[in-house]
């Protein structure tokens, strides 16, 4: 009887390993994962998927509804022989980023009262600092050209070490505060130095942040750095996940960037770590859909 139990236990373990690889990824991060890539590209609404398999010095091109070639900025961006999609990833050291000029954004320029968006990325973050992963976000030029963007760790308004999804209608800070406060922040912390899947969705009403395909709601809470402003003597109380934002996205003229955004002081909010894939959809994916395209070790 004990022998039968051992055999059944081993068989169950092998089955779970097989299912995990089939649904989410593979343990060998140095080879292309076509199963996962096919799942990503088969979902309706995909505009672009960058797998970052190109050599340093080359434009990083997407598959989908356009190539959207991302150019290196401030030097060559190294390629690492490790990644959950193509077997490769870009390594960002906190000084470099990739960029696509606004005139070339095309279908990536998502805006409107009821339009939706999903940004999802497969990353290994160092855990050191605020990092912009990707989107159309510019905090300085002409008063700000914010639109949509995926960040890791925005501590000023209760998003430290969390997946943050930023949306803006006006492109400018949120009155009466000095910065834009309109972002969701996941209930979970993003692990440092570990491959994971980070995403946010916006359905025209709510912004939601996900870690590894899982949405964790947050109860209403007092938001840091909001007390003493006009209308908020004791500070603002709100939920960060989901974040209520019915205003829609503005057509604000930002470039599409990966790894950094333009601040008053120049490029900043540099992502440090590896990015093995980045995808944009023109609709809000469901939690079940996001779970099917996560990489879980």
Where would I find each of the regions flagged by the language model?
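Extracellular glycan-associated modules
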Residues: 26-74, 80-297
